[in-house]
Amino acid sequence: LEDNQNNLKDITIRQMASANFTSTSAIYRLCNKFGFSGYSDMIYQLSSSNNTQLFSPDDLEQYIPAFIELLNKHRQHNIIVFGMGFSAPIADYLQQRLTLNGFYAMNVVHTEMLDIKYQDNSLFIVISNSGITPRLVEIVDNAFKNNIDIISFIANENSNLYQNVTLPIIVGSYNSFTHNNLVPNTFFGQVLIVFESLLYTYLSSIE
């Protein structure tokens, strides 16, 4: 797949199966494993991922009202910022920026603060490119069930971190094959830009 990303749309599922000495059923199972609805969906997504999708000012506009509303609601509450792997240092940056601007922010998850009794007193911010990391999904699902307000910065719209949050902020586009270090991954850099833009808009609104 990686060797033929420029002409994937010309390869049928039978050709793909034959070239890899497997069956079409195995290809379908692979598609499902990666979260695609079928072979055509996988090919479309992989072909589209060749072009890096950057966040635009027009994309930002749709998130501003809800972002401002949530920060106003939790101005004096605890804000937990969390990410795993490459998202961890991004979460640390967001936490420090919030703290410097007077918020009660931390980047360590205390699960008791995501209990239902804190549903009006906690805001949970998560960063994840894929949105499918099991431990992160478990934490977010529990917070969602307890009616905790959640903001997610995420690339994968087909994940729980998009479905089960108060405000999902889509950053770029998700590629299941981003493990290839030769392919540029702009997600983490874009999260910083998007967050800074949203925070600036919020701070400007309360001056």
Show the residue positions of the predicted features.
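Conserved N-terminal alpha-helical segment that immediately precedes and caps sugar-phosphate-binding
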Residues: L1-E207
